[in-house]
């Protein structure tokens, strides 16, 4: 099987796109007149039923515990299910994935042996997660099959899957999808829905953009194209639109302000030598469901995790130095709640949804305001409360913190001696 859940026959990990330096120019506030810009609205009076979705989808939505669409779902789904091209920027945790999952499942008419929808994303973890969302929402659509394809898995497994039980929806990373398409194992001639998640990450990397373009040219001219991301600079938006025909543009709470709903943000000034002791104190003092601790390198992730385990903290780490099989096993272990602390590099900084995470600690300062946005967006997702704490240990750290505050017009205060649990812990 090519599905990530089968965890078999993994090869050595291939080149990782996700650890590339991220250089995203500042976004301006102004977008063209077609764009939709609104502030955060927690609960809309209208429900998912108002979108006239299939009963099978509504049933799966109820099973998942969703009662009301988020703002981005409210803005996007009615147009997306009509087949319109969509480009959407909305901050982390606002339910962008469900927009294209539900819209695709609503429209798809599965035909045996034909791939109708293609979803591309830049990391294997994100591909695995998106595939699971399709599986979750297609519970009552048994004829619709979805599979995930990415590097690090023996390509023969993927070829056999496509030959024996071709899925209707393919989720994957550009490199592996292109390899399968070039060798004629994966036919894209019937694709009706072409989706890029975290599109800026793929289109800013020239290598990945070339792969995406080549894949795009293998699909029919007449298809729906949807692109989503938490960060879309003014410079990358025209690149996105080259793939589209008169897209509907939705910029929910455009990036001028970082107002992640319910997220409390603080910093701590300290020396490099004081970080371990302070982290230990925080983990003892704070109430948390699960916490993600971000560091700047593979070696620091491994060392810090070892230290935490020695101090009897329920910690696990994920970084790009591991085999894909090991990374996936650890990700599943954390997501399922077997461990409460995750030490990670920026590999986990984009797109990974774990609902129980309510605290993010930047043990090492991120390298840019964009990276900060993606990291702290791991806490307080789905409109729940959360806390982000950033260690500031140098002049360059202070500079990045100032950039974050200026760019997102947010006032990040020093962590007080006492912090009210109710401000960051879901009730």
From Swiss-Prot:
Keywords: ATP-binding, Helicase, Hydrolase, mRNA processing, mRNA splicing, mRNA transport, Nucleotide-binding, Nucleus, RNA-binding, Transport
Protein EC: 3.6.4.13
Sample GO molecular function, one term: double-stranded DNA binding
Main location as per UniProt: nucleus
Residues annotated to bind ATP: 90-97
EC class name: hydrolase
Keyword ATP-binding: yes
Catalyzed reactions: ATP + H2O = ADP + phosphate + H(+)
Domain (Helicase C-terminal) ranges: 278-423
Every Helicase ATP-binding domain range: 77-250
Motif Q motif positions after renumbering to this chain: 46-74
One of the protein's GO biological processes: response to cadmium ion
InterPro entries, alphabetized: DEAD/DEAH_box_helicase_dom, Helicase_ATP-bd, Helicase_C-like, P-loop_NTPase, RNA_helicase_DEAD_Q_motif
Stretches for region Disordered: 1-30
Comp. bias intervals (Acidic residues): 9-23
SUPFAM superfamilies per record: P-loop containing nucleoside triphosphate hydrolases (SSF52540)
Keyword flag Cell membrane: no
Protein location: Nucleus
PROSITE patterns: HELICASE_ATP_BIND_1, HELICASE_CTER, Q_MOTIF
Family: Belongs to the DEAD box helicase family. DECD subfamily.
Functional description taken from the UniProt entry: ATP-dependent RNA helicase involved in pre-mRNA splicing. Required for the export of mRNA out of the nucleus. In addition to ssRNA and dsRNA, binds dsDNA, but not ssDNA.
Protein name as annotated: DEAD-box ATP-dependent RNA helicase 15
Native source species: Arabidopsis thaliana (Mouse-ear cress)
Gene field: RH15
């Amino acid at each position: 099987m090519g599905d990530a859940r089968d965890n078999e026959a993994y090869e050595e990990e291939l080149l990782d796109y996700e650890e590339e330096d991220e250089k995203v120019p500042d976004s301006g506030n102004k977008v063209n007149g077609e764009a939709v810009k609104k502030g955060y609205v927690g609960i809309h009076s209208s429900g998912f039923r108002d979108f006239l979705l299939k009963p099978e989808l509504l049933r799966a939505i109820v099973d998942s515990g969703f009662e009301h669409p988020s703002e981005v779902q409210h803005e996007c789904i009615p147009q997306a299910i009509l087949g319109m091209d969509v480009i959407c920027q909305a901050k982390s945790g606002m339910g962008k994935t469900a927009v294209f999952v539900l819209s695709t499942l609503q429209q798809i008419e599965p035909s045996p042996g034909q791939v109708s929808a293609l979803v591309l994303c830049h990391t294997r973890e994100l591909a695995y997660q998106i595939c699971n969302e399709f599986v979750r929402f297609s519970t009552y659509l048994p004829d619709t099959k979805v599979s995930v394809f990415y590097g690090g898995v023996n390509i023969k497994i993927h070829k056999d899957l496509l030959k024996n039980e071709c899925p209707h929806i393919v989720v994957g990373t550009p490199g592996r999808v292109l390899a399968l398409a070039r060798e004629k194992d994966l036919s894209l001639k019937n694709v009706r829905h072409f989706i890029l998640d975290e599109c800026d990450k793929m289109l800013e990397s020239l290598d990945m953009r070339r792969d995406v373009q080549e894949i795009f040219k293998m699909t029919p001219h007449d298809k729906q194209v949807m692109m989503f991301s938490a960060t879309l600079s003014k410079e990358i938006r025209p690149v996105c639109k080259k793939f589209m025909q008169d897209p509907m543009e939705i910029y929910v709470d455009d990036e001028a302000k970082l107002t992640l709903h319910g997220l409390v943000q603080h910093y701590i000034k300290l020396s490099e030598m004081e970080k371990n002791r302070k982290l230990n104190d925080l983990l003892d003092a704070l109430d948390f469901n699960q916490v993600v601790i971000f560091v700047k390198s593979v070696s620091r992730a491994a060392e810090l995790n070892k230290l935490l385990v020695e101090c009897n903290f329920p910690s696990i780490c994920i970084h790009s130095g591991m085999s894909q099989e090991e990374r996936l096993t650890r990700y599943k272990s954390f997501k399922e709640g077997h461990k409460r602390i995750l030490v990670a590099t920026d590999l986990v900084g984009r797109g990974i949804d774990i609902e129980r995470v309510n605290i993010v600690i930047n043990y090492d300062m991120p390298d840019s305001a964009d990276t900060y946005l993606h990291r702290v967006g791991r806490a307080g997702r789905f409109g729940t409360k959360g806390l982000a704490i950033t260690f500031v240990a140098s002049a360059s750290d202070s500079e990045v913190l100032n950039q974050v505050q200026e760019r997102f017009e947010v006032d990040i205060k020093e962590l007080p001696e006492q912090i009210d649990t109710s401000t960051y812990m879901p009730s």
